[in-house]
Amino acid sequence: MTIQLIVTHAGGAHKDDFLACSLLAYMHGVPIQRRDPTEEDLANPAVCVVDVGGVHDPQLKNFDHHQFSRDAPPLCALSLVLQDLGLYEDALSFCSWLRPAEWLDTLGPNETAKLMEISRAALGALNSPLDMTLLSRFGSQRELHADSPVYQVMCMVGEDIVNYLRTLRERLNYLKANVQYWTIETDGEPIRALFLQQSEAIAKDPSFGIHAFIETEGMEDEIHAMVYPDRRGDGYGLSRYNDCQRLDFSQIESNEHVRFAHKRGFVAKVSTKDRVRLKELLQLAVVRDAG
């Protein structure tokens, strides 16, 4: 059945209902009404009822979690919509923001801060004007249509989440077949780098999926650097993986092959495509022990 309407609660908006409605708005392009659902809404599979109504029934497109018991898994409305789209497991694996969003909505800020191993004050400091403005503008509306700027932004957010998750698996398979691992000798432990060759197949976003790939391969503790095509120029980007302090690319900023090296040392852009030269640049970027 074709979806005709999205209904979510009135009043203050939270990240989970905003993102859940963003996904549904992108997928279906239908109006969003902020009000209590009727019994007819809950019984109508053409109406998505989000974060309100006291019912979770994917067949009827009811996506509320507030009726779940205190010891239930920390699923929010966003989780339930992602499950319905078949994207939840990949989102958990590759969207590091999802689990904290679930915790925040179901457990509250104090417990979320504990689980994230940060202070309550630090959690609050992570709020940005983007969060506050979008949630405030969304919460102030009674109905949103395709001509609403807020609705249009929501569709962009939903589109980016869906496209990221649906294309990531394809990119991971590509990386599995095409990456190389380099070992760069140093005075101490060698540096391990992941190298991805230039190709038209990845020209639009060459570095997409590399971090996720390293994690899925279980190589987080082995890789120190990444070498990948530079989408802004005809060369390569060199960057630290997980901000590995064994590399400082500002050390190579004066090299003739280097177009740009960040003063903080975490990334450089180079013109050479020669693999021998690329390995030499990595070696030159290795931080030597003082003395």
Regions from the PLM with identified roles:
Residues T2, A43-N44, D57:
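Short, well-ordered loop/turn elements at secondary-structure boundaries
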Residues M1-P31:
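Short, extreme N-terminal leader segments that mark the start of a protein/domain
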Residues A25-M27, H66-S69, L80-L82, N255-R259:
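Short, low-complexity, polar/charged sequence segments that are solvent-exposed and flexible
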Residues Q4-I6, A46-V49:
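Generic beta-sheet signal
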Residues V47-M132:
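A basic- and aromatic-enriched beta-loop-alpha substructure that forms the phosphate/nucleotide-
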Residues G11, K15-S22, P37, A43-A46, ...:
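C-terminal accessory domains and tails appended to enzymatic cores
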Residues H28-L42:
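A short, well-structured beta->alpha microelement
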